[in-house]
């Protein structure tokens, strides 16, 4: 599956979405800082699952209805930073959709996440990430899960990786930095955490009008890779036995 995550910088980059969908053919689109009051029902061939409701600039998830069927979408409030208490910019920092994959005939959970801004401590963001993962496990117990978005975590990502590993998740950074607005805070802000999925690539896409660059996550189901490996090994064993019996040909 192919998932794009994009922080629109107060909805400024909203006009780029159709072109992104057409150029990169994502199955899912996860947005942060989008105008939730005026979201289109469709972006290219992607359908709006839902968006956050309690803040004008919020989160949204779009998905390909030919590939997926939406079972349930839910928004979550996470622990607030001082900035949230004073400015109240975001009540809900997580939205997630439980989907049925009509191709693989299985369910999984995808989420769009926006952590507290850099005025907060990394410890608060780790709390938000941990709580988000716990909420996702309740939405889809035991299901493969992908949470993408603006983690606002440009430094000490090794520690973050260790923390999410302890809860059964993997942290994956993109191939190049995703944020360039401030000289001293450039780096990987937009990340992916996953469980039960094999993330083969996270690509930083070209910059548009946002201060964040979109990322494109390519992932497969972990046990699907195992089944393919087992099948290949079974085929290899079979080839060896045939070769031993028939010296005139090799399969």
Model-identified regions with their sequence ranges:
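Short glycine-/acidic-enriched loop or helix-start segments at secondary-structure transitions
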Residues: 14-15, 38-42, 46, 122, ...
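Active-site-proximal segments of metal-dependent phosphoesterases and phosphodiesterases across multiple
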Residues: 112-132, 155-164, 172
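Active-site beta-strand/loop signature of hydrolases that rely on acidic residues for catalysis
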Residues: 3-8, 17-40, 62, 97, ...
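Structural motif corresponding to alpha-helix initiation and N-cap regions
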Residues: 11-15, 56, 186
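Structured beta-strand-rich core segments of catalytic domains in phosphoester-bond hydrolases
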Residues: 28-109, 113, 198, 205-207
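Glycine-rich, phosphate-binding/catalytic loops in enzymes
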Residues: 20-23, 41-48, 127-129, 162-166
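Acidic/histidine-rich helix-loop elements
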Residues: 3-11, 80-88, 119-121
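Metal-dependent phosphoester-hydrolase catalytic domains
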Residues: 72, 137-143, 151-251
